[in-house]
Curated annotation (Swiss-Prot):
SUPFAM superfamilies: Ferritin-like. Its EC number is 1.17.4.1. Keywords: Deoxyribonucleotide synthesis, DNA replication, Early protein, Iron, Metal-binding, Oxidoreductase, Viral DNA replication. GO terms for molecular function: metal ion binding; ribonucleoside-diphosphate reductase activity, thioredoxin disulfide as acceptor. This is Ribonucleoside-diphosphate reductase small chain. Fe cation 1 binds at residues 70, 101, 104. The active site is at residue 108. GO terms for biological process: deoxyribonucleotide biosynthetic process; DNA replication; viral DNA genome replication.
Length: 327
């Protein structure tokens, strides 16, 4: 049996630490803590309305995916990994990750409510699995590889890394290009926070596979999972570009295809197996962001003294009154 699944019936407390490397991962993740209300999207509303309709349609598809994807990740953590894994330090990491995924899900809901005032259109985005066949297909693929009956723990961890890495990465890239256009500062800030978190989640899955598994999946199985994820991303990107009538400022469909293959080869390296695609990074100017090296934002600078949320809905309206005593 895998070490991660063996319960120590004599251990009731986290201290003394028995797995210091896993504990360090947890503490790093803890240091990234933020909340969905810490980003100001007021300027984004004007930028969004000024954006050409095809470009808006592209980003709506991305939001529709993200709203669904984080909920699936939360479900897997709560119903599978956190019930099965017995190493406390790993459970601490996954507990923190689940909390972060809740923040991400709330953040995407705030983005939709802020940018899209029409309630019917909001509902279409919130119902991504029902309204978008490719999102439903991606969700089914994730659930397939997270099934503990059909897949080993190692296969599920590889699938989890593919979700947190491959399925999310092109969407992070597309949003980050808005920063180069000097628009949508709130959306970009959310993107930087979330992509940094997800990079940590993906890396931790790779760490567990390399350092804790007795039965690491064969390379051909790892490649199968990763290639399936890439094919799904290709299909989603094609769908989103069709909605955008084939044109989005900053990048082409082919560039995103190439980038996700470049990223997947890096994931292969993290999983200690051979690369698959052997392609160059089509976006060398954004390497720092892609490698999840975005600096930790100073929240004392980010938070206004009195935060004003721009969502025109009482259920989503927040005001934070912050002063030095809060810290």
């Amino acid at each position: 049996m895998e070490e991660l699944l063996i319960e120590d019936s004599q251990r009731f407390t986290i201290f003394p630490i028995q797995h210091p490397e896993c504990w360090n991962w947890y503490k790093k993740l803890e240091s990234l803590t933020w909340t969905a209300q810490e980003v100001d999207m007021c300027k984004d509303i004007d930028d969004w309305e000024a954006m050409p309709k095809p470009q808006r349609e592209f980003y709506k598809q991305i939001l529709a995916f993200f709203v669904v994807a984080d909920e699936i990740v939360i479900e897997n953590l709560l119903t599978n990994f956190m019930r099965e894994i017995k190493v406390k330090e790993v459970l601490y990491f996954y507990t923190m990750q689940a909390a972060q995924e809740c923040v991400h899900s709330e953040a995407y809901s705030i983005q939709v409510k802020t940018l899209i005032p029409d309630e019917k259109e909001q509902q279409r985005i919130f119902s991504g699995i029902e309204k978008h066949p490719i999102i439903r297909k991606m969700a089914q693929w994730v659930q397939q590889w997270m099934d503990p009956v059909k897949n080993s723990l190692g296969e599920r961890l590889v699938g989890f890394a593919a979700v947190e890495g491959i399925l999310f990465q092109n969407h992070f890239v597309a949003i980050q290009f808005l920063k180069e256009q000097n628009i949508m500062p709130g959306l970009v800030s959310y993107n930087e926070f979330i992509s940094r978190d997800e990079g940590m989640h993906c890396s931790f899955a790779c760490f567990l596979i390399s350092n804790y598994l007795n039965n690491i999946p064969e390379e051909k199985i790892i490649h199968k999972i990763l290639k399936e994820a890439v094919e799904l991303v290709d299909e989603f990107i094609s769908y989103a570009f069709d909605k955008a009538r084939g044109s989005v400022p900053g990048f082409s469909k082919e560039m995103l295809f190439q980038y996700i293959r470049y990223f997947t080869d890096n994931l292969c390296f993290m999983l200690q197996c051979k690369s698959i695609y052997k392609v160059e990074n089509p976006f060398p100017q954004m390497t720092k962001f892609f490698l999840n090296e975005v600096e930790k934002t100073n929240f004392f600078e980010l938070r206004p003294t009195q935060y004003q949320n721009c969502v025109k809905d009482d259920a989503f309206a927040f005001k934070l009154f912050l002063n030095d005593d809060d810290f």
